Design a protein with these regions (language model features):
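Bacterial N-terminal signal peptides that target proteins for export
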Residues: 1-10
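A residue-level marker of the well-folded mature domains of exported/periplasmic proteins
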Residues: 6, 20-336
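Bacterial N-terminal signal peptides
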Residues: 9-18
């Protein structure tokens, strides 16, 4: 992946540097035939398909039995029945992208009481619900970076909106918090956040919400959509609109979803990490926990296959790495 443009504000040192004298699992083998289950936010989201494919690839490498189960809608209540079934099946570990930070805690605690290891990826629960959280990148950097990209495109002036996923999505709300903090800085004094809309990580609703934003705010200059479903739906709407090229759209998208919109001029830049690597890293963390090689404590290190040695940071967080910014110059170098 040459010539990638990285947002430099994202600190990844904490995921790569040994933080203490806690145990090192580097030379400890992973148990064979572990049962690892992966519960994405929803199973029909293209991003989640890529993410869990990475998880299953890791399972194949380490000789684990991996499976993906989950709801078709991105709600916490819909994830509960799957978690309960996996507890009954006595999985060794459950890897979860949470649709709510708190609603799933009682069920995850029940799983942990049954000695099932819990790892969250992509979207976290409160720390008491799991041992390790695989974070895509620094949450602060993700939020700040999207504001910075948009601000440059609109010359730091004008009304902007955010098109999010669901109102309770942990990762979305954390990133939005950092966006709002970034917008308080003096350089953004001429920018105004007029609305946060929610497309519920559904393509058609996100498409309709984009239309609604543009109708409600005729002076809108830009939209940030920190969800792969939302940013692709917004781009699809703008691509056939008279506002194509006049409204700046940035957010988090996959290159394969966004390629046509970059090439036709609808979108100049967007950002993401490799979702497959998120799932891959989460599977290795789950397997190391289930093997008794790590406990999720700050400073522990573990081997994560092709991703090398990783260190657990504060509150059990492991950061994958920095964001990559995609544009017309580099998008064809990526295929996911």
């Amino acid at each position: 992946m040459t010539k990638t443009s990285l947002i430099t504000t994202i600190a990844v040192v904490c995921s790569l540097t040994f933080l203490g004298t806690v145990g090192d699992s580097q030379d400890k083998p992973i148990k064979k035939d572990l049962k690892l289950a992966f519960v994405p936010k929803n199973v029909n989201n293209p991003y989640n398909v890529i993410e869990t494919k990475g998880s299953l690839d890791a399972c194949q490498e380490i000789g684990a039995q991996g499976k993906v189960v989950g709801p078709s809608d991105a709600s916490a209540s819909s994830q509960v029945s799957y978690i309960n079934t996996l507890i009954t099946q006595r999985q060794n570990a459950i890897v979860l992208a949470a649709n709510d930070p708190n609603a799933l805690i009682p069920y995850l605690k029940r799983a942990r009481e049954q000695k099932i290891q819990i790892v969250t990826m992509d979207s976290d629960t409160a720390p008491e619900g799991r041992k390790v959280f695989i974070n895509q990148a620094s949450s602060e950097g993700i939020g700040q970076g999207q504001v910075q990209i948009l601000a440059k495109q609109i010359d730091f002036k004008g009304e902007i909106a955010i098109l999010s996923a669901t109102p309770n999505a942990t990762n979305q709300n954390t990133w939005i918090k950092y966006m709002e903090e970034e917008l308080q800085k003096p350089e953004y004094k001429d920018m105004k956040l007029v609305r946060i809309a929610y497309g519920n990580d559904e393509d058609q609703k996100s498409f309709t919400e984009t239309q609604g934003l543009l109708e409600a705010y005729p002076n809108l200059k830009g939209i940030i959509s920190p969800t792969t479903v939302g940013v692709a739906a917004a781009a699809r709407y703008l691509s056939t609109s008279p506002l194509k090229g006049k409204i700046a759209l940035v957010g988090l998208g996959t290159p394969n979803q966004m390629r046509q919109f970059v090439k036709d001029g609808t979108v100049k830049e967007f950002a993401l990490w490799n979702p497959s690597d998120v799932g891959y890293l989460a599977a290795y963390a789950a397997a190391q926990l289930a093997s008794g090689n790590i406990e999720g404590k700050e400073g522990e290190t573990f081997s994560a296959g092709k991703l090398g040695s990783r260190t657990i940071g504060k509150d059990g967080v492991v950061i994958l790495g920095p964001l990559t910014v995609f544009d017309a110059a580099n998008i064809d170098q990526f295929n996911f």
